[in-house]
């Protein structure tokens, strides 16, 4: 990320905060993003693993404790700043698969192979996302943001799965498909139930 991208990122964040502030404070804000990729790099592209996609005062290609602390502090500060205006819900990271799920399933089908059971273990998931979880938990403690956890809807038997009933729930390796995102409807209903009760 060069200085131009850094400037564009700050401008985009400023624009988003301004737009959000135009809405009634009764309307909750739900934050869903790939938070871990910005701190830790890509999860399955070898040449982009362990290279942060974001930086603060100076560009660094190493993941250091200092960088992770600064990144976490930024996440907490941003969430708490937004929570001054309205209820804020932060979504825990969506599990990232190591392969393009629909492509792998289609390839297996083309060659008459059994449906591949694409998944990652909960241990792998938590190892990848522990920094983000800790920052999210700190934001809950500091300013009362709420957490939306997709794991009960996407993971079972100690694993997070790339498909359900023979259908991919991702449209690549880390973005949920239309079919997959419908699995999270009960999770998001919490937001609307809480909003309706106020």
Where do the PLM segments sit?
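Extracellular glycan-modifying ectodomains
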Residues: 1-198
């Amino acid at each position: 990320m060069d200085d131009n991208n850094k400037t564009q990122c700050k401008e985009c964040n400023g624009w988003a905060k301004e737009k959000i502030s135009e809405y009634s404070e009764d309307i909750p804000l739900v934050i869903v993003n790939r938070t871990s990729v910005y701190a830790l790099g890509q999860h399955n592209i070898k040449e982009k693993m362990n290279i942060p996609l974001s930086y603060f005062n100076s560009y660094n290609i190493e993941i250091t404790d200092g960088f992770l602390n600064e990144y976490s502090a930024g996440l907490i500060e941003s969430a708490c700043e937004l929570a001054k205006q309205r209820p804020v819900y932060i979504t825990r990271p969506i599990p990232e698969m190591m392969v393009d799920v629909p492509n792998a399933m289609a390839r297996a089908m083309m060659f008459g192979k059994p449906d591949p059971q694409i998944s990652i273990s909960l241990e792998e998931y938590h190892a990848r996302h522990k920094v983000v979880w800790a920052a999210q938990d700190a934001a809950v403690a500091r300013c009362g943001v709420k957490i939306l956890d997709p794991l009960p809807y996407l993971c079972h038997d100690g694993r997070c799965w790339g498909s359900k009933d023979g259908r991919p729930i991702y449209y690549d390796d880390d973005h949920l498909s239309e079919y997959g995102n419908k699995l999270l409807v009960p999770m998001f209903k919490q937001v609307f139930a809480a909003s309706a009760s106020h």
